[in-house]
Amino acid sequence: MGHKVHPTGIRLGIAKDWNSKWYANKAEFASYLAADLKVREMLRKKLAQAGVSKILIERPAKTARVTIHTARPGVVIGKRGEDIEKLRKEVSELMGVPAHINVTEVRKPELDAQLVAESIAQQLERRIMFRRAMKRSVGNAMRLGALGIKVNVAGRLNGAEIARSEWYREGRVPLHTLRADIDYGFAEASTTYGIIGIKVWIYKGEVFDFSQVGQEKQDDSPRNDRNDRGDRGDRPSRPAREAR
């Protein structure tokens, strides 16, 4: 199942956290969710050149707090904070409550899966060979400390008539390990031949160390009825069947 489901969705509450944090009753839940989708869509369109990694939304006490993780905070803020003030007003109108916008810088964009996927998409739109773009991104991530990275591109690669998918991997990407910190990103490249999808998985290590806990559970667990050699012991003899 690790290869089928979304890497972030299966780890929510274990190694990953939600991008939206708020509580709502049944009457308000749908409107809150729709507002979050509109805000994210608007911000990604406005900040297409800012390298936005993710957008976190919180709703404390009839207000809204939006945190934008970006590789280029100067593009988001603008001169003397003019651009971010315009964004704040638009977000407040969409959400219907006073909004505050915080900007967080992504210091290593080469280790952010979403930014890596968008970088590969931009290279493909500039007609750079997909294998070169993949290997360049993989090399940069491994050089900066990633334990593993996998890149998958799908579509009409190099203008081929039949669409196909190719992937490249270095290191380990344990998708079945729930405590693994795996960052996932997806982007689309609009080329003259059609849409090319890019998926990126980056493994950064384990979030929790369960080795000691597992050892204690193993020591405290009751043993089965076996002797030291691992045998199951003597079985009760069955009565012999009478010959017909």
Curated annotation (Swiss-Prot):
Domain KH type-2 span(s) in chain numbering: 39-107
Any GO BP: translation
Record SUPFAM superfamilies: Prokaryotic type KH domain (KH-domain type II), Ribosomal protein S3 C-terminal domain
InterPro entries noted in UniProt: KH_dom, KH_dom-like_a/b, KH_dom_type_2, KH_sf_prok-type, Ribosomal_S3_C_sf, Ribosomal_uS3_bac-typ, Ribosomal_uS3_C, Ribosomal_uS3_CS
Biased segments, Basic and acidic residues type: 216-244
Function comment: Binds the lower part of the 30S subunit head. Binds mRNA in the 70S ribosome, positioning it for translation.
Subunit-structure text: Part of the 30S ribosomal subunit. Forms a tight complex with proteins S10 and S14.
Protein name per the record: Small ribosomal subunit protein uS3
